[in-house]
Amino acid sequence: TATTEIYTLSLHDALPISLSDFRGKYVLLDFWASWCPPCRKENPNVVNAFQQYKDKNFTIVGISLDKDKAKWQKAIADDHLTWAHVSDLKYWDSEIPALYGVRGIPANVLLDPNGVIIAKNITGEDLQNTLKEVIK
């Protein structure tokens, strides 16, 4: 198991965010982009997981590989993604996906309350099953 890097990036409303802000919670780092059809198709499943577990010591941080801020913000609103979102709007030149070995999207990383990676690339039913198993 690897401990995650702590980084700071701007939220879509321009507030800085750091992973250390979420210590003590399970955190799903959700790598996606507005221009990615498979990501947008997976979003309802992610929304469902968030609604089901947000009051059980769980949250999501959306990490976008967008380069157009307006399209990114519109996708967040259109897909009802009500958790924290970050992007440096650098597309694949962003350093954060590389930190987690992300080479394609959608992708995600599940961190335990200590910031340790406990699962990667869990989508669909696997996401629900993993959360059900680890979040008691």
Question: Which residues does each predicted region cover?
Answer:
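Active-site acidic short loop of glycosyltransferases
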Residues: 23-25, 55, 81, 102
